Amino acid sequence: MLLLAILLSLFALIRADVNIVEPGPGDTFSGADGTVSINLKWVDNGAYPPLDKVAYYLFSLCYGPNTKIQCVYKPDTKITPDDLDKDDAGTYSYKFDIQSSVVGSGQFYVQVFAWVDGQGYTLHYTPRIELTNMGGPTTFELLTYTDTIQPVPQTSIRTGTDTNTQSFDASSVYSLPYTEQTLKTRVAPIQQQPGTKVTATTWSRRYPTSAVTFYSTFRSSLDQLSTLTPAWNYTVSSAVNYATPAAMPSDNGGWYNPIKRQSLSTRKLNVRYLSS
């Protein structure tokens, strides 16, 4: 019954800002045929602006850390709502085609830019995907960087005389308890930069415990749709150990012949004369 209520509430959402559902994390797309096609799908997430206000979309192929987004393919073709497919469940879809010569193989994500005339824009990102059999140039960072979560959405929308700017500043949300966040997509708490000394003498709970709320009637919207788990926001330093290796036990007097510890002498047994 609870599952049914959740499903019904999802379909009862008002038409609103972008919530990407495809591609999924780690999905692989091949450019062996000269073109790689990424199927993009998104639904309404209950936040402003309504999707019927979106004038056009722009799609870009990007890579790199969440704090250093680099878009390597940014076609300026404006995709209008008439260019999109929409099924009966309210899922929008678009096939984003990219020539395999644009970039080399590696880990990428797609940036979805939605423009609302006279009000502003929103930015959303797909989970990280893998492009294989690509024939374009590559970089060391593209080949080596990996992560599990996409960049967080950004919103800059003017409603009336106010500007509604919801840009996820990682440095600010890391310290905000999960239960105090109010956006549709929340950020899970992560480890902070450790100090150089341990000063605590007792333990204490850093964040409140979680809870679940059951509803007796169907809701027309959801308080939250997704949770992001950011990458580390701290660094771990390392150095080369230049200390001279210790001598082997046989060289520093710590080794001894085990025969000196024997209290009984050994003798050879002939197994042919052993009885069971």
From Swiss-Prot:
Q: Signal peptide: which range, if any?
A: 1-16
> What's this protein's name?
Cell wall synthesis protein KRE9
* Pfam families, per the entry: Kre9_KNH1_C
Q: Which InterPro entries match?
A: Kre9/Knh1, Kre9/Knh1_C
Biological source species:
Candida glabrata (strain ATCC 2001 / BCRC 20586 / JCM 3761 / NBRC 0622 / NRRL Y-65 / CBS 138)
Q: Which gene encodes it?
A: KRE9
What are the BP-aspect GO terms?
(1->6)-beta-D-glucan biosynthetic process; (1->6)-beta-D-glucan metabolic process; cell wall biogenesis; fungal-type cell wall organization
Reply yes or no: does the keyword Secreted apply: yes
Would the keyword Lipid biosynthesis be found if you checked this record's keyword annotation? no
Role noted for this protein: Involved in cell wall beta(1->6) glucan synthesis.
| Main location (coarse class) | secreted
Record's keyword terms, sorted: Cell wall, Cell wall biogenesis/degradation, Glycoprotein, Secreted, Signal
- Kindly list the GO CC terms recorded for this protein: extracellular region; fungal biofilm matrix
Explain the post-translational modification.
Answer: O-glycosylated.
Subcellular location per the Swiss-Prot or TrEMBL entry: Secreted, Cell wall
Into which family does the record put it?
Belongs to the KRE9/KNH1 family.
